[in-house]
Amino acid sequence: MRQYSVPARFSVDERDNVAAMVFEHERDDPDHIIYQRQIDGIWTDITCAEAARHIRSAALGLIALGVQAGDRVSIFSATCYEWAILDLAILAVGAVTVPIYETSSAEQVRWVLQNSEAVLAFAETDAHAAMIAELTGDLPALRRVLVINGSGPKALEQLAEEGGSVDRAELTARLDALRSSDPATLIYTSGTTGRPKGCQLTHSNLLHEIRGTQECLPTLLTPGQRLLVFLPLAHVLARALTLSAFASKVTVGFTSDIKNLLPLFAVFKPTVVVSVPRVFEKVYNTAEQNASNDGKGAIFKLAAQTAVDWSRAWDDGRPGLLLRAKHALFDRLVYHKLRAALGGDCHAAVSGGAPLGARLGHFYRGVGLTIYEGYGLTETSAAVTVNQIDALKIGTVGKLVPGNSLRIADDGELLVRGGVVFSGYWRNEQATDEAFTDGWFRTGDLGAIDDDGFLSITGRKKELIVTAGGKNVAPAVLEDQLRAHPLISQAMVVGDAKPFIGALITIDPEAFGGWKQRNSKADHAAVRDLAEDPDLVAEVDAAVKEANLAVSHAESIRKFRILHVDFTEDTGELTPTMKVKRNVVAEKFSVEIEAIYTKD
């Protein structure tokens, strides 16, 4: 069993807590612009002093409402300025933030609020509040629901009014009583299989994440940088990086308006973004599709290959004269347009949650956007490894965040321990016992470390497919390759206890229209009408053959089915971070899976 450790050059003391930085910034740099928030569509500056005032006001309101240290308080909302303020206010009074994705179903909301025994909930809209109201009979601990942005009084205004009579000394006493070992947040896993479990993270866990990522990404996490957060703050990656940015006095903006990101980029002009790989895949695929629709597909493919070659050349030394000339040409024709679409100043991104893929990483670096890919789980407070400013290897998930250790078991499973690793699942001793071996957290992921200390994720242990012939196949390699094709939205590899590997494939609805036009298909034709069309099947078959080049013959996809519908979060096949719920898909499309193994 191989073991690796990176010591921390920082410390987390017993009396440290996450909320203290709010009031340190207020004291040391009150006029620094720490946030920008949208007010009536206009980005408005929020200084450290103003943010602290809002957080203090909300915290005093929580005290007035009877929230005690250790109480669970839920935020059921999309990403917004108020989310960040409420989170820090909850932490400041010693309570525990319980995030809920704004897209969660009533049953998911019921489970989280009931299991956590939340005493107070913040609902983003009237509709979110109404959903909770329908569940109150099952939620005896829940005392009140405040609405962040509804038709009635706003939550922050209500808290300010409630807390107006509370002495500031009460908040000071709460802060003084906090210990780094105290719980800070209870985050429920997104649940690709089974019922979500509550991961308890302490102030110490979050501070190790904040300070560790500051060491790894010092030039990104520094005053003067501008971070646009559009991932759900209920996701540990977005939350942790937002806290790291706040600690580093990066100016942070929030939006949940994913459909209108490009106009927001143009106005906010981020220097850094945080996202999951599917977003980077979609940006690339959309650019390729648009170029193809305009008759410039060949130019884009040449430009993309040149960007990849350029990035790889820097790993090997430096680009040659011809490659530099090609890169300069495509920079004028293609790359500058992509950078402009991101606001013109964006030079870096942080990616996690799923594998990015080496080709995509090289493409973006060749265009001028370096993606620092990391690896982690909710149970590790987000990143436990990450590519770093002075240690970057595209195609890997980087090196250990300082203050942590990593083991690779004999079967390839990654085991971790250290400052970012959680202490256990909320009120679930059995799951906690199963998750740890001799103090090491079993991630369930498979990986390998190269001679330079960079980690690569090779698959998910629970997702390993064992064919009838006994071949172990990690589906992620094939699925990532397939999703890289602009026409493919999602792919799920199947074949457990079957004679060969197959795949279910969905078509990207945004790319489908352009494909129909280029291939002289009827505009009104749906995927179900063309699922067996020879041209569509041939296009997908080419993508499958390309993906198969990444694996051995025994692991390759022999047959596939094009599904009539795409996977979505609304219809239950995807988690909020766009991971496929394999058990849901297997059950819902069992007939299609069996058809793969039926002789034609």
Curated annotation (Swiss-Prot):
Extract one GO molecular function annotation from the record: long-chain fatty acid-CoA ligase activity
Tell me the pathway.
Answer: Lipid metabolism; fatty acid biosynthesis
Q: What is its EC number?
A: 6.2.1.3
**GO annotations of cellular component type:** membrane
PANTHER family, from UniProt? AMP-DEPENDENT SYNTHETASE_LIGASE DOMAIN-CONTAINING PROTEIN, LONG-CHAIN-FATTY-ACID--COA LIGASE
The record lists the organism as Mycobacterium marinum (strain ATCC BAA-535 / M)
- What is one Gene Ontology biological process annotated in the Swiss-Prot or TrEMBL record? fatty acid biosynthetic process
Which keywords has UniProt assigned to this entry? ATP-binding, Fatty acid metabolism, Ligase, Lipid metabolism, Nucleotide-binding
User: Which reaction is the catalytic activity of this chain?
Assistant: a long-chain fatty acid + ATP + CoA = a long-chain fatty acyl-CoA + AMP + diphosphate
Q: What is this protein called?
A: Long-chain-fatty-acid--CoA ligase FadD15
Cited SUPFAM superfamilies: Acetyl-CoA synthetase-like
What does the function comment of this entry state?
Catalyzes the activation of long-chain fatty acids as acyl-coenzyme A (acyl-CoA), which are then transferred to the multifunctional polyketide synthase (PKS) type III for further chain extension.
Top-level EC class, please? Answer: ligase
Q: Which family does it belong to?
A: Belongs to the ATP-dependent AMP-binding enzyme family.
Query: Does the keyword section mention Nucleotide-binding?
Result: yes
